[in-house]
């Protein structure tokens, strides 16, 4: 029951699945935006603000190309004691990431933005706090061998909806925030804007 054209500015299959299961009709269009080219921005933004900036940048990038559509941009930032982490690019980096997170609590800041005609309509970030249990080197190696390269798509090198749940001893936060798309607040906003009809 959609009243408008929606575009998801993300190539994430997990985000697309969430929207599809929620009954939304949308197109997928990846943003042409290099997240690693943000060194200067990181120095002046908190991790939560950075997630909003990146979600907005992605939504604006796609909105500029498809001005009449309502564009959803998303991003997630992992914050460990104020240090910002990006997605890993190899199994070796994945191993190091899990060693770093082992026995510590980190935060995931997931932002969602809505843009139309290149203009921001809404952006907001939500946080989840993830306590990783102490992990042995043997466990990390076995885990990475089992899950394969799919975890390289996750900034935390885990997929909470699968085997990644075994990495944690405590989680404080919304499931959708952990996945990287704060779905419930997004649906509320889409209803408020009249995009989803009751």
Curated annotation (Swiss-Prot):
Active site residues according to the UniProt entry: 75
Disulfide bonding pattern of the chain: none
Cofactor: a divalent metal cation
SUPFAM superfamilies named in the record: ITPase-like
Highest taxon above the source species: Bacteria
Compartments, as annotated in UniProt: Cytoplasm
GO MF annotation: an example: nucleoside triphosphate diphosphatase activity
One Gene Ontology biological process: nucleotide metabolic process
UniProt key word Hydrolase: yes
EC number, UniProt record: 3.6.1.-
Entry GO terms, CC: cytoplasm
Chief location category: cytoplasm
Site (Important for substrate specificity): 14, 76, 161
InterPro entries from the UniProt entry: ITPase-like_fam, Maf-like
Reaction catalyzed: N(7)-methyl-GTP + H2O = N(7)-methyl-GMP + diphosphate + H(+)
Keywords assigned: Cytoplasm, Hydrolase, Nucleotide metabolism
Pfam families reported for this sequence: Maf (PF02545)
Function: Nucleoside triphosphate pyrophosphatase that hydrolyzes 7-methyl-GTP (m(7)GTP). May have a dual role in cell division arrest and in preventing the incorporation of modified nucleotides into cellular nucleic acids.
PANTHER family listed in its UniProt record: BIFUNCTIONAL DTTP/UTP PYROPHOSPHATASE/METHYLTRANSFERASE PROTEIN-RELATED, BIFUNCTIONAL DTTP_UTP PYROPHOSPHATASE_METHYLTRANSFERASE PROTEIN-RELATED
Family of this protein: Belongs to the Maf family. YceF subfamily.
Protein name per UniProt: 7-methyl-GTP pyrophosphatase
Organism, as annotated: Bartonella quintana (strain Toulouse)
């Amino acid at each position: 029951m959609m009243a408008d054209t929606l575009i998801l500015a993300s190539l994430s299959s997990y985000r697309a699945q969430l929207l599809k299961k929620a009954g939304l009709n949308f197109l997928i269009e990846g943003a042409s935006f290099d997240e690693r080219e943000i060194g200067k921005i990181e120095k002046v933004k908190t991790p939560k603000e950075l997630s909003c900036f990146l979600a907005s940048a992605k939504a604006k990038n796609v909105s500029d190309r498809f001005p009449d559509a309502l564009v959803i941009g998303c991003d997630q930032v992992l914050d460990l004691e104020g240090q910002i982490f990006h997605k890993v690019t190899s199994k070796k980096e994945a191993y190091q990431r899990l060693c770093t997170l082992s026995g510590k609590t980190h935060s995931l800041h997931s932002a969602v933005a809505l843009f139309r005609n290149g203009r921001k309509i809404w952006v907001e970030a939500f946080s989840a706090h993830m306590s990783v249990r102490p992990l042995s080197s043997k466990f990390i190696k076995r885990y990475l061998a089992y899950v394969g390269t799919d975890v390289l798509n996750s900034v935390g090198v885990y997929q909470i909806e699968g085997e990644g749940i075994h990495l944690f001893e405590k989680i404080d936060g919304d499931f959708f925030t952990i996945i990287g798309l704060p779905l419930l607040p997004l649906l509320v906003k889409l209803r408020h804007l009249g995009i989803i009809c009751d």
